[in-house]
Structures are given as C-alpha cells and as structure tokens.
A protein has these predicted regions:
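Sec-dependent signal peptide cleavage junction
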Residues: 2-21
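Short Lys/Arg-enriched alpha/beta "domain-start" segment
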Residues: 16-42
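One face of beta-strands
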Residues: 23-25, 36-38, 49-51, 64-66, ...
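Cationic, glycine-rich low-complexity segments
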Residues: 41-139
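Membrane-interfacial hairpin junctions
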Residues: 152-162
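Transmembrane alpha-helical hairpins and terminal membrane-anchor modules
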Residues: 162-182
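Short, solvent-exposed mixed-charge patches
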Residues: 224-226
Length: 226
C-alpha cells in the first residue's frame, strides 16, 4: 500500500474544529480483496487519519497514519506493520506537495499524494470547455484545503474554490447553473504508478478565460487509462 484511501467526508473535516468520522471500504488488488478501516479526527488545526488495511479474512496488514497540521503547514506520515512497528515516517511542507489529495474520477476514491514526482510525461493538450447550461454540483471528494466542485464532467475536470470565486465575482454563477462561458485549458498529461501493477494517468491543468486571465490550476487522474 502506497497511498491512503480517504473517506468521502474528508473535505468536511477541514471546515470543523471538532470532527470525528469512522468509515470502512473494500478494494481489489492483483485479484485479492482487501478491507480498509479508517478513523478521521479533526481537532483545531490538526486533521489525523488512521487507516488500517486488512486481508479479506480480517488479518491486519499495515497501518498508515497521516496528520495534517495547518497551523505550521506540514503533513506528517507514518507507516506501521501488522505488529505496529514503525516502518517509516516522513514530513512534508504544504509547498513541497503538488497536491495533498487526488481523486479517481471513475471510483471517486481519494488518496494522498506524498510526492511531487509527476511520473512519465505523455503529452500536452489544449482545449476550450463550454460551460453553457452546466449545473454546479458540489462533490465532497476529500480535499484538505478546500471543497472541490465538478464542472464539465465529460472531460473529468474538478474546479476548486478559487474558480468558483472567480465565476461568482464575474456574475456568471446563478442559483443552480452557469451562464454561457468558455474556459481555456492547458494540460500536461503524465503516466504515474499508483499501486503495484497499476498506473494512473495524471492531468495537471492550468485554466484561463478566453481573454487569457488565469483562473486556477488543478490536478486530477484516471485509473487504467493511457
């Protein structure tokens, strides 16, 4: 296991000073079924997530502990074996991490990215997204620093809070939809390993108005797509 699968309520934790959440999930890796039990605790500026990974028979494999301290801008990571012996521990500043969380658009699983290594460069893409008639749908998909919103789902793009603020200030955000508007996307595409035998295609996009005004930068992924 190289990444922590987070509960769908992870984004909410950053909005509350006192928040506790327990969640359970299963996943399949190399034909074997596994279970993860996760406890998330938010206290003030600290968000701690403890994830225990089990075999399908209930045998503990390993434990991953992630602590986000927003007061100092640092993420702490611990990995322990089935006997709870420390395997490794790392800490990263927020500015060292390309994205704190990454979401699989197919399964909506969310995992923490601890490295700014993008992987193998595949291609560069540029295109324009027409937002005419698109509804603005809030998706709680595990962002630590801000809620994530999905616009133009046919291209799998998640637009962050800065985008929403820009649209609102421009008077383009209605009660439930966005008035006609175009966004220009400049995207670098990479192939990056996730777990053993699996790869994710990672997208790093900069978004602009058609007049060239910068809006925001985003990071998303697709599993099993190249």
């Amino acid at each position: 296991m190289v990444a922590t699968i987070l509960s769908p309520c992870y984004a909410q934790a950053s909005e509350y000073s006192d928040y506790v959440k327990h969640s359970e999930a299963t996943f399949v890796e190399n034909g074997k079924k596994y279970k993860v039990e996760e406890d998330l605790i938010s206290r003030g500026d600290k968000i701690k997530t403890t994830s225990n990974f089990f075999t399908d028979e209930g045998v503990l494999i390993e434990t991953q502990i992630t602590t986000v301290d927003r007061s100092v801008g640092i993420v702490y990571f611990e990995n322990r074996n089935s006997d709870q012996e420390l395997i490794n521990s790392e800490s990263y500043r927020f500015d060292q991490i390309l994205e704190l969380t990454e979401s699989d658009e197919e399964t909506h699983d969310v995992f923490v990215t601890y490295s700014n290594d993008r992987g193998k460069f595949l291609r560069h893409e540029e295109y324009t997204i027409n937002l005419t008639g698109k509804k603005l749908t809030a998706l709680v998909v595990g962002s630590i620093l801000a809620g994530v919103f999905a616009i133009a789902p046919e291209v799998g793009i998640s637009i962050g809070g800065k985008f929403v603020a820009a649209v609102t200030s421009a008077g383009l955000l209605g009660a439930g939809s966005i008035m006609p508007w175009n966004v220009r996307a400049s995207v670098d595409v990479y192939s990056s390993p996730y777990r053993t035998g699996k790869h994710y295609t990672r997208f790093y996009g900069d978004f602009y108005t058609t007049d060239g005004e910068y809006i925001t930068s985003l990071h998303w992924s697709k599993r099993g797509y190249h």
